[in-house]
Regions:
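Short, glycine/charged-enriched hinge/interface segments at domain edges or termini
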Residues: 1-58
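Short glycine/threonine-rich loop/turn motifs
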Residues: 31, 37, 41, 54-139
Length: 139
């Protein structure tokens, strides 16, 4: 403990920052959802979970599996002032999945991809830097 105190000097070893209000954009991918073949049942759940925190969902888009449109939708939310963008709609281990490429094409720095959350479901965390802010993009 003495070494930790010495290393920190007069500053605390760590601090807990207050949670700030966040604007969130939701990009729901998947051609099945866009075509209306399946109902998007996750966005209402996601909005409910986000409502437990001081957030505002500034919009939702459904670009299907069009990689360029996924990228454009993410960037549109960032340009509208989103503090976070969540991509939902079935990102998977499927090599044809367009969501990871759409996120990468924003220029965001992908910090993790491939951690299976459920069998067949994947997690991607990326950060887009704009005007000194790191905006998380989750997929």
């Amino acid at each position: 403990m003495d070494r930790a105190v010495e290393a920190a000097g007069p500053e605390p070893i760590f601090s807990i920052l207050p949670y700030h209000f966040k604007k969130v954009g939701i990009v729901t991918t998947g051609s099945e959802v866009k075509k209306g073949l399946i109902q998007d049942t996750f966005t209402p759940v996601l909005k409910e979970k986000l409502s437990e925190y001081p957030t505002e969902v500034i919009g939702q888009t459904t670009p299907g599996d069009d990689k360029a449109q996924i990228t454009d939708d993410i960037m549109e939310f960032i340009n509208q002032g989103a503090d976070m963008v969540v991509c939902s709609g079935g990102m998977s281990v499927d090599p044809d999945d367009r969501t990871p490429g759409g996120i990468r094409d924003t220029g965001a720095r992908v910090v993790t991809y491939g951690a299976p959350v459920l069998p067949g479901a994947m997690l991607l965390i990326a950060y887009y830097e704009k005007e000194g802010k790191c905006i998380p993009i989750l997929g």
